[in-house]
Curated annotation (Swiss-Prot):
The keyword Manganese applies. Its EC number is 3.5.4.2. Belongs to the metallo-dependent hydrolases superfamily. Adenine deaminase family. This is Adenine deaminase. One of its GO terms (biological process) is adenine catabolic process. It comes from the Bacteria.
Length: 569
């Protein structure tokens, strides 16, 4: 809606709410850095010029840039609610994000997506959503819900929904699965974007995927892959998350000719990284240090994303655009000093200012339908060698190994001396009683157990341990607190991190979650865990779409065969 007061302020007929003077304005439209003033009225930029104002702030030559935008993120990976997430990323200059609520949708379906939209209202960051396209991800596990075309149609009418989220089922696209194509057609008929997800896809299959309308990809890991997709018309989101870090590898592809087709995203970023390292701002800073033109780097983090998703009033500093503005002392470190969101200062000297809004209530739907007393992690002894999941450090892929396992009194047992531990996935959504059982190598636990209700993509409870009693204690702790992470030994929980929102997120500030995680990680290390973040490693072992051997509540999955295999050969 046109605000006539903004027009009046732009003409100088009335005083503006705010003028930021003596700025070096990063103009992402012209590619220049211009000395000047910015007048703000009613939350929008009124003029790139000096005006009478109720409040005047002298920036004394500091840089003024557009707010940064994350092109693709799963807020659930931050382990906090959308409101608490926004409190953290605004400190780093992120004023808008495009979030895919895929994780909570796998647990709560339509209600989960609705919660995420509602929980973002009033946050200092503009949180927009792409409706999940692949819920559940596969038939090889029990999800809490499913989203069909009829379920996503109402969301496509919502003003906060800007597209269809990453279409992970690229085989379904290229082999013309009717339901997959129906979802894409629904998005296109509503003039929404269709985000892609096509790791390694090339040649004729890539062309077929693009012919269906997939428009972007955040899964590129090599320059060759990204350049082929750019040349074929795709937009590329360069990703720098907690697990997947592609910035250094992909920055060399950025040129003056192709930079308008490139954006920045985080995908999955955990509390420690968000609090201690930063967000999209660190991608901008590193890009500039590695030789990307500063205005180009900032444009990739703002205007490119806004234009792709149709956010016409965001991404730049110009009359009529939303006054999402960053004050930055220099463009090398790109340390964000002050942040204005809709013309209101929300960050001053790097610190968040108090917000009058109370966080929204968390959803009341239970997602812990587990008969803890009936849990049985017994594995009967087998006659052949066992198939064992082998962890690969710092990777979400695993290897498949075979070997002898410890057997006694007709049972197959954990063998911590050889780093072979029991692993189980307990179905938590529908009370089926399903328990998938197997063995894993590489965790290093010498005693105790670790359990988590964060287990991609269906987020059942996954547990690894040395003995059954501790595995049961860890699962009980997770179930009793409505979801979360737990470390147990001696038949009791030693430390926990509650995640009561769908078993994925906390309703507490990120700083508190980070403290709980620090204690939990220390406990895991004391039990012998070798990985830097054993819970992150654990969370991907139930994902049956990433090779090579994984486990779900239905059993052991050979991902290359895309089918179940027996535990013993």
């Amino acid at each position: 809606m046109i605000d006539d007061q903004v027009i009046a302020a732009a003409r100088g007929d009335i005083p503006c709410d705010l003028v930021l003077k003596n700025a070096q304005i990063v103009n992402v439209f012209s590619g220049e850095i211009q000395k000047g003033d910015v007048a703000v009225q009613g939350g929008k930029v009124a003029a790139l010029d000096s005006r009478d104002a109720k409040i005047t702030v002298d920036l004394e030559g500091r840089f003024l840039t557009p707010g940064l935008i994350d092109a693709h993120v799963h807020i659930e990976s931050s382990m906090v609610s959308p409101y608490q997430y926004a409190r953290t990323v605004i400190l780093h200059g992120t004023t808008a994000v495009i979030a895919d609520p895929h994780e909570i949708a796998n647990v709560m379906g339509v209600d989960g997506v609705s919660y995420m939209i509602q929980a973002a209202e009033g946050a200092p960051v503009g949180i927009f959503y792409a409706v999940p396209s692949c819920v559940p991800a596969t038939h090889l596990e029990t999800a809490g819900a499913s989203l069909e075309t009829k379920d996503i149609l109402p969301f496509l009418e919502h003003p906060k929904i800007v597209g269809l989220a990453e279409m992970m089922n690229f085989p379904g696209v290229i082999y013309r699965d009717p339901e997959v194509l129906a979802k894409m057609n629904a998005a296109k008929s509503h003039r929404k974007t269709v985000d892609g997800h096509a790791p390694g896809l090339s040649g004729a299959d890539l062309q077929a995927y693009l012919a269906a309308g997939a428009a972007s990809d955040h899964e590129c890991t090599t320059p060759e892959e990204a350049l082929e997709k750019l040349a074929s018309g795709m937009r590329i989101m360069i990703r720098q998350g907690t697990g997947a870090k592609n910035l250094n590898d992909l920055l060399p592809i950025v040129t003056e000719q192709n930079s308008r087709r490139i954006m920045f995203c985080s995908d999955d970023r955990h509390p420690y990284d968000l609090l201690e390292k930063g967000h999209i701002n660190i991608m901008v800073a590193r890009s500039i240090r590695q030789g990307v033109d500063p205005v180009t780097a900032i444009r990739m983090a703002s205007l490119n994303t806004a234009e792709y998703f149709g956010l016409r009033d965001r991404g730049g500093i110009a009359p009529g655009m939303r006054a999402d503005l960053l004050v930055v002392p220099d463009l090398v470190d790109f340390h964000v000093q002050d942040v204005y969101s809709g013309g209101v200062k929300v960050v001053e000297d790097g610190c968040g200012l108090p917000s009058p809004m109370d966080p929204p209530p968390r959803p009341q739907t239970s997602s812990m339908n587990v008969d803890v007393d009936g849990l049985d992690f017994t594995i009967k002894a087998g006659s052949g060698k066992a198939r064992i999941i082998k962890l690969i450090p710092d990777q979400v892929v695993t290897a498949a190994m075979t070997g002898d396992v410890l057997q006694k009194n007709g049972e197959a047992l954990s063998d911590p001396g050889n780093d072979i531990l029991k692993i189980a996935v307990v179905e938590r959504h529908k009370g089926t009683g399903n328990i998938g059982l197997g063995f894993v190598n590489g965790f290093g636990l010498q005693k105790g157990a670790l359990a988590s209700s964060v287990a991609h993509d269906s987020h059942n409870i996954i547990v690894v341990g040395v003995d059954d009693a501790d595995m049961k204690a860890a699962v009980k702790a997770v179930a009793d607190m409505g979801g979360g992470l737990a470390a147990a030994a001696g038949g009791k929980a030693l430390s926990v991190c509650p995640l009561p929102i769908a078993g994925l997120m906390s309703d507490q500030p990120m700083e508190q979650v980070r403290r709980q995680l620090d204690i939990l990680m220390q406990t895991a290390k004391e039990l012998g865990a070798k990985a830097e973040d054993p819970f992150m490693s654990l969370s991907f072992l139930a994902l049956p779409v990433i090779p090579e051997l994984k486990i779900t509540d239905k059993g052991l999955v050979d991902v290359n065969l895309f089918n179940f295999v027996s535990l013993f050969e």
